[in-house]
Swiss-Prot record:
One of its GO terms (molecular function) is mycothiol synthase activity. It comes from Cellulomonas flavigena (strain ATCC 482 / DSM 20109 / BCRC 11376 / JCM 18109 / NBRC 3775 / NCIMB 8073 / NRS 134). GO terms for biological process: mycothiol biosynthetic process. Monomer. Residues 336-348 have a biased composition (Polar residues). Belongs to the acetyltransferase family. MshD subfamily. 1D-myo-inositol 2-(L-cysteinylamino)-2-deoxy-alpha-D-glucopyranoside binds at residues 44, 196, 235, 253, 291. Residues 12-156, 169-330 form the N-acetyltransferase domain. The lineage of its organism: Bacteria, Bacillati, Actinomycetota, Actinomycetes, Micrococcales. This is Mycothiol acetyltransferase. It catalyses: 1D-myo-inositol 2-(L-cysteinylamino)-2-deoxy-alpha-D-glucopyranoside + acetyl-CoA = mycothiol + CoA + H(+).
Length: 348
């Protein structure tokens, strides 16, 4: 997120999958920004949705005219409009094209998309919780509504304990083409109140199974009498992309831990986390990360007991709660000229 003071050349928007060349442009913009800022401006799901025809999103693209009549992609926003109550956006602006109104224009368009359903709120992720992001949020009437923590542990210093599974529970690896429906049912129940994870569709799961990092051997299912009770899904980040590790070091991730509500209270979450940590340690990894909501104090306490410490924070901004002095103030007045002082961008 950064200040902008001059408008971009043009904005276009579309639904469905982006044309392959445009999707590649967005990925290139994302990687350029990662190298510049040290923080990924877009999370995994928006990147997967770039090429998903059924994704419930609006793509907003900011273009800058270059020599010969060609156009260069200098900004991108993705607005998740799959909910009737909250639209969620992630934004990125090219480092060399900031302070030109691009971010403000993208944010204004995102606000318009959210407002297509009366009363729907716009929430915007700002990855890294940088000081500039907080300043921009304050200038545009946004407040923090959620924090997502990245936590990390050195498993050579904090080796995982032996998993204490309930009697009769057996663990096996996920079988592609066989276990998707059962896993999705338990995942939806386990994350019924989670705004992103609980909505994972068959297409979302298939997209992850097609990713280079997917390894069914690291996707462990806990069953009793053939009934799925929970799972731990791990991931390995290559050294060129890994957060929190030494340069070039592969880093493991406890990607998803889910327990069916009927199996909660049996210590399944702790046991599954220990299984995931042991799997990643046995692969020769030293650093393991995970992401958890700051509001999930029980999980945070469990992870800290296992040696995890907070290493990064992503922040979601949204309108002030009802009853606060700023309640009712627009996030962005979409009639504002993009070149007005104080223009800003999220995720850049």
């Amino acid at each position: 997120m950064s200040s902008d003071i001059e408008a971009p050349t043009s904005l276009t928007s579309m639904r469905g999958a982006l044309p392959p060349a445009v999707a590649d442009d967005v990925r290139a913009l994302h990687l350029t920004t990662v190298r510049h800022d040290g923080v990924p401006p877009l999370s995994e799901q928006p990147l997967l949705w770039l090429s998903d025809q059924e994704a419930p999103v609006v793509h907003v693209l900011a273009w800058h005219a270059v020599t010969g009549g060609a156009q260069e992609l200098v900004g991108y926003a993705q607005v998740d409009v799959g909910s009737s109550t909250t639209a969620r956006a992630e934004l990125v602006v090219a480092p060399g094209h900031r302070r030109r109104g691009t971010g403000r224009s993208l944010l204004a368009h995102a606000a318009q998309e959210a407002a297509s359903i009366p009363g729907r709120r716009l929430h915007v992720w700002a990855h890294g919780d940088l000081p500039a992001a907080r300043a921009t949020a304050a200038a545009t009437g946004l407040v923090v509504v959620r924090e997502l923590w990245r936590m990390a542990v050195d498993v050579t210093q904090h080796p995982p304990g032996a998993p204490q599974l309930p009697p009769g529970v057996a663990v096996r690896a996920f079988v592609p083409g066989q276990d998707e429906d059962a896993w999705r049912r338990v995942n939806a129940r386990a994350f019924a109140h989670h705004p992103e994870q609980g909505r994972m569709t068959s297409a979302d799961l298939r997209a992850r199974e097609s990713e280079p990092w997917f390894d069914p051997a690291g996707f462990l299912l806990a069953e009793r009498d053939g009934q799925l009770l929970g799972s731990v899904w791990t991931k390995v980040h290559p050294g060129s992309e890994a957060p929190d590790g030494a340069p070039g070091e592969e880093v493991g991730e406890i990607y998803v831990v889910g327990v069916d509500p009927d199996a909660q209270g049996l210590g399944m979450g702790r046991a599954l986390t220990a299984l995931g940590l042991a799997h990643l340690r046995d692969r020769g990894l030293r650093t393991v990360i995970l992401y958890t909501g700051a509001e999930n104090t029980v999980a945070v306490h469990t992870y800290r007991r296992a040696g995890f410490a907070r290493t990064a924070v992503d922040v979601m901004y949204g309108p002030p709660p009802a009853g606060s002095p700023a309640h009712g103030t627009p996030l962005v007045r979409v009639t504002d000229t993009p070149s007005s002082p104080g223009d800003a961008t999220m995720g850049s």
